[in-house]
Amino acid sequence: MAASETAPFGVSAASKGGGGVAGARAQHGQLAVAGRVHDALVFAAGAVAAVLVLLATASFLSPMPVTNLVAFRSLPVSVASTSAASAAIDADVGVRGGPGAAGRTFYDDSRVSYAVEVGRRGGITGWDARRAAWMRLRYPRGLNATAAGRERVVMVSGSQAPPCRGEGGDHLLLRFLKNKVDYCRLHGVELLYNNALLQPRMLAYWAKIPAVRAAMLAHPDAEWVWWVDADAVFTDMDFSLPLHKYKDHNLVVYGWNKEVYGERSWVGLNAGVFLIRNCQWSLDFMDSWARMGPASPEYARWGSVLHDTLRGKSDKESDDQSALVYLLSEHEEKWGAKTYLEKGYFFQGYWVEVVDRLDDIAARYEAAERRPSAAAAHLRRRHAEREHERYAAARNAAVRGAVPGPAGGGQSGWRRPFVTHFTGCQPCGGEPNKIYSKKSCADGMNRALNFADDQVLRNYGYRHKDPLSDEVRPLPFDYPAAR
């Protein structure tokens, strides 16, 4: 019923009821109260119906705005129930917040800025204490009440705002984004995807620093912020970050100590994926890192310094990766001591070393599940997606016991490569580095994305027809024993 229909109904019912009740009052005093109750109920029903219709209409006429900063919650809820669900979760764990929340926090301090302001004196100070004070106010029962003691992680990724120049580039970016959404959903990680240039002069690979810094302030409840380049693919959906391994460190980067600290090679690490703790050390570090970028008046000088200092650097451009190597090697005690160069697994693997091995790796996992044992039969059981982590742990144990080699998931490990990074392929720009062909990049990206997607689709009873096909087929019962 439309809202315009309910209003006349309410008015006419009231006016007619008024005359009827007056006559009833004179003749039948006992019926007067019943008549008023009846009319009140009719009016109330009409009013409620009108409000519900107006709300429903408003939801269609005023859809939620789409911004260029998109956040994905780790636990999906329907749009209609988002506020109610969040309020219920907050109430369950004793979260205190909202516009009228008591107590001032760093958000009320006008001197605290989300922006990277290169060259400006000051910056955020006392962040550890400010963050702790915010959490005491907002989480009086403790932050980890809903996360089984896990440290919270926010993943940040992003791409450019304009459409891609390369043919099919936007479609590839969508597939890369889907891959990250899938991983985050399976592992309880929140994803923030940004395509706004938060600092106009910090272009290209430098744009990650303002995004990560802003995420730290927007998510003080997150212990870690995890930057992942747009062209990086999660190729092991079972793997969870070993955060306990980094308890004494504030920055985790894929790299090698010898190449960074001994040889000072500009390719001794890769800055396309990194994990950084939400703390004062990290804010100070990113300020120092940003001062070597294009927003700095000394940008050209830093390019010359990096060229003269780092082994193998042929150009005089100050890029984020070279700057990171310089900071760690030049200030090893200040920055290097709290940085973990991860090489025990493919925190980000070079795609050329990975994609040709994916078929063999998939066969290795399937062989472990086809073994004639009760444990393998248990792994083949169909299950709900929310049970993924339990099955992942059991599957890793089965493969580890069946396949020789280290546990890392690197070039010789038994594990799937965790992240495969298509550095140099430039899927959005359309022109890969001259050392790669377009076909090798296209096939490699498609193969890696399908390899990862098969791990997700299995929970839904499907897989890709072949490693390079978009077509999917249903899985037989008791897969992979039945093929």
From Swiss-Prot:
Glycans are attached at residue 144. One of its GO terms (molecular function) is galactosyltransferase activity. Keywords: Glycoprotein, Glycosyltransferase, Golgi apparatus, Membrane, Signal-anchor, Transferase, Transmembrane, Transmembrane helix. It is an enzyme of class 2 (transferase). GO terms for cellular component: endosome; Golgi membrane; trans-Golgi network. Residues 62-483 are lumenal. The chain crosses the membrane at residues 41-61. PANTHER family: GLYCOSYLTRANSFERASE 6-RELATED, XYLOGLUCAN 6-XYLOSYLTRANSFERASE 5-RELATED-RELATED. Probable glycosyltransferase that may be involved in the biosynthesis of xyloglucan. Belongs to the glycosyltransferase 34 family. This is Probable glycosyltransferase 6. The gene is GT6.
